[in-house]
Each structure stands twice: as C-alpha cells, then as structure tokens.
C-alpha cells in the first residue's frame, strides 16, 4: 500500500456509544451538473440491520447536510447505496484503524470511478464517500472504542451507528473541521457541537459546528471549487484518541 504524504493526517475519533434505532432515506434534489453541488455517497455496510435503515437519513445524515448547506451556501446531494460488494462488505474491524481508513480511501475512490464508468454519476474528487457501519471499528459499545475515522481533508470516512453525532463528526473532518475548535453550548441545557470531544452522554447534540469550525469548513470548501490547496491541521489534532 502506498503511504500517503505527510500532508494527510489520520484523525480517529473515539466517542461514547449508546445505540439508537436508525435507518435509511435518500435525497437527490440538486442538479448534478451544478458546479456548486457536492455529493455524499452513503454506503450502508451489510451488517446494518434492515430495521435500522428507515431513520438513518433523518437522524444521522440530515443534521449534517442542513448545517453544511447553511455554512457553505452549496447544495449537498445524498445518494444512499447498499448491497454492493466489495464496498458494502468491507472489512472495517482491523487491529490497525489507520490501515482501515487507508484501505477505505483507496476503495472509495474506486467506487466513484466505477459509478462514472457505469454512467451513474460523474467522477469528482470533491465528493465524499462514507461507509456507515452497525458496529464500532474497534472496541465495544460497553467499554468504548473507535466509533469512526477519517483522514483530514480527504474524501472518505467511516462512521458507526452509535452516537448520532459520529457521522457529522467524521464528515466534518473531511472538510477540515478540527477537535480543538469544538465547543459546548448552553440553551436551557448543555449540548456539544459536532467536533467536540470527548463526548459526555448527559449532554445533548447541538447538530451544529462552532463558529471557528464553520469558518474552516467554508474556507476549505471554497478552496475546492477555486482550485486552491487549503489544508492546515494543528499538531494536537494529529493524535489518535483513546
């Protein structure tokens, strides 16, 4: 496997897990040829039970897409896929989670190329591919473990169906959001923004990014369309969290 250059940093997010009922939906409203539109390909792993699929979009995906569109002014198109090996049966529970995301990064690029070859969608490096899994990548829901993983500023991520915030957290990393800019907010009760870590189950999910991360995301996404190379991850966010 080729080693990524030092400009790519592995960010592994370990979140406290309490499993909820989940599910599936699909949106396809923006015009694919609109240059301001990004696509998220959400691939359900084969281990996700059918009973969980009816609410995945509304509970996990939509909170992120609403916030992203508010931040960037750009539309997100969500395409849900499933029952498609070798993508939907990808072996994500490995001893080395960094190797896991490296393999998924390669495989997800192949997935986009395959869709382009089959005239299903045009290939774009900017589009994101996220594998949604039923189980943690490592550890257990009882004792804790790795709930999701993403390379900062790259178009692939994996998120488990534990905390509803995990999917938005990992996608946030792919758009250059960082832990250090995560916040706790208060509006009658305390809540955590998408990037705040470590998670405390007593606090609610804000389903928003902090103002600092909003600016990071906006700048980064604008750079994707302007052809600029904006990628700066502070040292403290390179660390693998246990």
Positions of PLM-derived features:
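Short, polar loop/linker segments at the starts of domains and inter-domain junctions
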Residues: 51-59, 146-147, 206-209
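Bacterial N-terminal signal peptides
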Residues: 9-18
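Short, solvent-exposed loop/turn elements at domain surfaces
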Residues: 47-53, 139-141, 203-206
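The catalytic-center signature of Zn2+-dependent metalloproteases
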Residues: 147-242
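Propeptide-to-catalytic entry region of secreted or membrane-anchored zinc metalloproteases
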Residues: 23-121, 225-241
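Bacterial N-terminal signal peptides that target proteins for export
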Residues: 1-8
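Active-site-proximal segment of zinc-dependent metalloprotease catalytic domains
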Residues: 28-31, 110-185
């Amino acid at each position: 496997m080729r080693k990524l250059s030092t400009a790519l940093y592995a960010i592994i997010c370990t979140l406290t897990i309490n499993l909820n009922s989940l599910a599936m939906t699909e949106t396809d409203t923006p015009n694919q040829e609109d240059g301001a539109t990004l696509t998220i390909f959400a691939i359900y792993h084969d281990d996700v039970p059918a009973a969980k699929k009816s609410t995945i979009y509304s509970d996990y995906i939509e909170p992120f897409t609403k916030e992203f569109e508010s931040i960037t002014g750009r539309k997100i198109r969500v395409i849900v896929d499933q029952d498609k090996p070798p993508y939907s049966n990808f072996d994500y529970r490995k001893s080395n989670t960094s190797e896991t995301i490296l393999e998924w990064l390669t495989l997800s690029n192949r997935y986009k190329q395959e869709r382009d070859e089959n005239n299903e969608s045009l290939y774009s490096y900017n589009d994101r591919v996220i594998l949604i899994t039923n189980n943690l990548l490592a550890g257990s829901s009882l004792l804790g473990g790795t709930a999701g993983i993403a390379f900062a500023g790259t178009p692939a991520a994996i998120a488990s169906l534990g905390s509803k915030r995990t999917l938005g957290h990992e996608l946030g990393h792919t758009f250059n959001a960082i832990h250090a800019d995560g916040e706790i907010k208060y509006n009658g009760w305390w809540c955590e923004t998408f990037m705040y870590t470590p998670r405390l189950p007593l606090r609610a999910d804000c389903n928003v990014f902090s103002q600092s991360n909003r600016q990071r995301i906006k700048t980064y996404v604008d750079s994707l369309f302007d052809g600029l190379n904006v990628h700066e991850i502070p040292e403290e966010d390179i660390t693998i969290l246990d």
